[in-house]
Amino acid sequence: MVKPCWRIGAGMERSKINPTKVDGLTWYKDLGLHTFGEFSMAMIQANSVMEDQCQIESGPLTFNNPTVQGTFVGVYDGHGGPEASRFIADNIFPKLKKFASEGREISEQVISKAFAETDKDFLKTVTKQWPTNPQMASVGSCCLAGVICNGLVYIANTGDSRAVLGRSERGGVRAVQLSVEHNANLESARQELWSLHPNDPTILVMKHRLWRVKGVIQVTRSIGDAYLKRAEFNREPLLPKFRLPEHFTKPILSADPSVTITRLSPQDEFIILASDGLWEHLSNQEAVDIVHNSPRQGIARRLLKAALKEAAKKREMRYSDLTEIHPGVRRHFHDDITVIVVYLNPHPVKTNSWASPLSIRGGYPMHSTS
Amino acid sequence: MKHLIRRLSRVADSSSEFSIRRSTSSFRNRRGHHRLHAPPPPWSICPARRVNTVPAGHVPVYVGEEMERFVVSAELMNHPIFVGLLNRSAQEYGYAQKGVLHIPCHVIVFERVVETLRLGGFEGSGDLENLVASLLSGDELIPETTE
């Protein structure tokens, strides 16, 4: 059993207090304790630079109201580079605390404001770097955030990561999806874009048998991706593949999260939050069955391995041979994958753990071949 | 792109000395334990049409329009030249292709590239060096989508 002995720290010092491990391309924390129970985290890199980031923060969720205690979980699946997902991991939780402090509580509006300001600030960074680093305009990230507080779980999602609740039912466990996703290959996301851009016949284009916004990107909402939000970036020196042939006035992608609020019941055992890299290989029910039927220690790594075995099977190769494939090349077999399993207890684990907040960040720095 | 296809065709015309049979025997040698003086070749290739299961350490790929199936060593996948072939695949079919990876390259060129890699690289092979330079350069070979 891991004792709740964590303190907030920074950089290396923090990682000594909260030992996390790296094994080749895998980063993991097999078991830890958050305000309402245990958790397990694991990530694997497939791109030449790890584009996924994640974090878990447990303790006070405001700066001024010590009674608002809870757990914040973030999964950030970057694309076009790691800068946007890293920016979110650096900024979204402090912003959430700032907005929560204004009303001295957590709410849907607080979370949405944290998303909006994180996007706004990232776009400011893009503007600042435009003369020297214009490719920042084509970097973006999905953002999945879960907040557990006062018996409620808030799931806010921009992009196509997913949160799934495991609810015990007649001797088994049922998967209940808590997140709403924004991917052009979902009918609802396509309808939304078509209705927002009725005069643009090329707002969605099928490419490689998949729907893509402007023929480029699958997610229909994101943090970053400045080139699809502000026309000022739709010009040289941005790479031609990101430049749209026509001028646009209305942002094509939005950073607004879809937020769901669920009151937790004693039947709610755990929540799995993961980037789409996991869900392209495991169904919601397969994932909750694995968690329900396995020991808690290392459960996130177990899910990761199940997804990788499935990825290897699809390419008709052995899992052990997949592990020989280097980052970058790996992307042809699977995506970067992040998975966090948060077990739920109806009451805080230990009252005195409130004084010992937890802060763990995953995915940076990872192996880089570029 | 047309330039690259022409180059591929030209190399293909001069590659008759490399055969699948030779590749197959080299694969068998790699599995043997009694070879003296000659260490097992680091990379191998064999046609997989008559092989029911993929040998350990290998990955199947489909090559060319005819979708000829080969197995190549997992180690070979990491070679920059092979990465160039995989990037062509992602550019043509995306990362989310279902099942075995499909490499858009003439079968005969593919065999020659892999065989040359197996025999120790590209030194002194001008045509292939040019081919590889083509494979590894140019924006057209970078996947055009972002994921």
Curated annotation (Swiss-Prot), chain A:
GO BP terms: negative regulation of leaf senescence
Details of cofactor binding: Binds 2 magnesium or manganese ions per subunit.
Chief subcellular location: membrane
Entry's Gene Ontology molecular function annotations: metal ion binding; phosphatase activity; protein serine/threonine phosphatase activity
Keywords carried by this UniProt record: Cell membrane, Hydrolase, Magnesium, Manganese, Membrane, Metal-binding, Protein phosphatase
Outcome reported for the amino acid change (mutating D276N): Phosphatase-dead, unable to repress the plasma membrane H(+)-ATPase AHA2 activity
The PPM-type phosphatase domain, residue ranges: 35-344
Cofactor: Mg(2+); Mn(2+)
EC number, as in UniProt: 3.1.3.16
Role noted for this protein: Dephosphorylates and represses plasma membrane H(+)-ATPases (PM H(+)-ATPases, e.g. AHA1 and AHA2), thus influencing negatively plant growth and fitness. Promotes the apical hook maintenance of etiolated seedlings.
Subunit structure: Interacts with SAUR19. Interacts with AHA2 at the plasma membrane.
Family note: Belongs to the PP2C family.
Protein name: Probable protein phosphatase 2C 67
Native species: Arabidopsis thaliana
Gene: PP2C67
Swiss-Prot record, chain B:
GO biological-process terms attached to the record: auxin transport; auxin-activated signaling pathway; positive gravitropism; root radial pattern formation
Main location: cytoplasm
Induction behaviour: By auxin.
Subcellular location: Cytoplasm
Tissue specificity annotation: Specifically expressed in the quiescent center and cortex or endodermis initials of root stem niches. Expressed in vascular tissues from hypocotyls, petioles and cotyledons.
Keyword terms of this UniProt record: Auxin signaling pathway, Cytoplasm, Developmental protein, Growth regulation
Keyword field contains Kinase: no
Keyword Transcription regulation in annotation: no
Listed InterPro entries: SAUR_fam
A single cellular component GO annotation: cytoplasm
Family to which the UniProt record says this protein belongs: Belongs to the ARG7 family.
Miscellaneous notes: Plants over-expressing SAUR41 display pleiotropic auxin-related phenotypes. These phenotypes include elongated hypocotyls, increased length of primary roots, increased numbers of lateral roots, increased vegetative biomass, twisted inflorescence stems, overexpanded petals, reduced seed setting and increased basipetal auxin transport in hypocotyls.
Function statement: Plays a role in the regulation of cell expansion, root meristem patterning and auxin transport.
Protein name, as recorded: Auxin-responsive protein SAUR41
Species the sequence originates in: Arabidopsis thaliana
